[in-house]
Amino acid sequence: MPCTRSRPSLYSLSYIKRGKTRNCLYPFWSPYAYYLYCYKYRITLREKMLPCCYRSITYKEQEDLTLRPHCCLPCSCLPYSCLPCSESLEGLQVGRSTAQEKDHSQLKELYSAGNLTVLSADPLLHQDPVQLDFHFRLTPHSSAHWHGLLCDHQLFLDIPFQALEQGNRESLTATLEYVEEKTNVDSVFVNFQSNHKDRGALLRAFSYMGFEVVRPDHPALPPWDNVIFMVYPLERDLGQPGQ
């Protein structure tokens, strides 16, 4: 006799899991010794009606949230409070398989001209997000570093320490020129905490350089809390092939 119980046929639960995992490919003192990950899990319970009872089937889906670029060794030596965004240390670094980690094992020089050197962890034609570091020499003994992540024709940059200094502005200009001329990137994003002590000055400085504030619900933004994103759109000819 068929079961007549009245029950919902679908239950769903979502949660986010963050953590830190040891990367054994690097010594413990390396800035790459650990990577931080963030997974979004969705557990769904479906119930099907059978002649005598309900049958439950559980599905568990895992969604990798957006990566965050690593800091290089000089930047990792800065005090925690001096990092461009404290959430960088809580960054959403997705766990990878051993084979993938070997492919991303070291940054290699991709381009060097004038004061700008560009380092990459992977070929730019790779389908996965790629780490891009931009090192701009200010003096013989100092340089400005912009750490970025290239993903789906979009470049996300973490602002360096003391981003408002003139040297850092020059380094960003050189970075934007390289991105426009040498890559197929359509948009460059910078980000900083919404409660940053220099929030107003940062908004004015980046606006002056052509950046625009991005609304929080923009579909291209990663799910980072308390962060302001600004975007620099690159004008591309419709017939221009990706480089």
From Swiss-Prot:
One of its GO terms (biological process) is negative regulation of polyamine transmembrane transport. One of its GO terms (cellular component) is nucleus. One of its GO terms (molecular function) is ankyrin repeat binding. InterPro entries: Acyl_CoA_acyltransferase (IPR016181), ODC_AZ (IPR002993), ODC_AZ_sf (IPR038581). The keyword Thylakoid does not apply. Signal peptide: none annotated. This is Ornithine decarboxylase antizyme 3. It comes from Rattus norvegicus (Rat). The lineage of its organism: Eukaryota, Metazoa, Chordata, Craniata, Vertebrata. The gene is Oaz3.
